[in-house]
Amino acid sequence: MSVADIKKSEIVAQFQRAQGDTGSPEVQVALLTARINELTGHFKEHMKDHHSRRGLLRMVSRRRKLLDYLKGRNPDSYRALIEKLGLRK
């Protein structure tokens, strides 16, 4: 397993609702947040990488939509997830 696979399985294990859950909004948001954080570090070094920046903006938009869905469906889970990931100041 690569480092990315190990990190991904740790994130899934931490945020899954039940054993084997990989598709819940909580897991998807956590995985997107990890990828967004990695790309943010990438842009500190490669400021002119606009091709990847477009992908980053797409990921941020997708995370926002998932968070909106979760907020409407399960506000308690939304608040817990935001707190755990440290997304809101």
Curated annotation (Swiss-Prot):
Among the entry's GO cellular component annotations, what is one?
cytosolic small ribosomal subunit
- Give the record's keywords alphabetically: Ribonucleoprotein, Ribosomal protein, RNA-binding, rRNA-binding
GO terms of biological process kind: translation
Pfam families the UniProt entry points to: Ribosomal_S15
Q: Say yes or no: keyword Ribosomal protein present.
A: yes
Among its keywords, does the record have DNA repair? no
GO MF entries? rRNA binding; structural constituent of ribosome
Question: Which residues are in coiled coils?
Answer: none
NCBIfam families, per this entry? S15_bact
Similarity annotation: Belongs to the universal ribosomal protein uS15 family.
Quaternary structure, from the entry: Part of the 30S ribosomal subunit. Forms a bridge to the 50S subunit in the 70S ribosome, contacting the 23S rRNA.
Q: What does this protein do?
A: One of the primary rRNA binding proteins, it binds directly to 16S rRNA where it helps nucleate assembly of the platform of the 30S subunit by binding and bridging several RNA helices of the 16S rRNA. Forms an intersubunit bridge (bridge B4) with the 23S rRNA of the 50S subunit in the ribosome.
Can you say what this protein is called? Small ribosomal subunit protein uS15
Q: Which organism is it from?
A: Bordetella pertussis (strain Tohama I / ATCC BAA-589 / NCTC 13251)
Question: What's the source species' lineage?
Answer: Bacteria, Pseudomonadati, Pseudomonadota, Betaproteobacteria, Burkholderiales
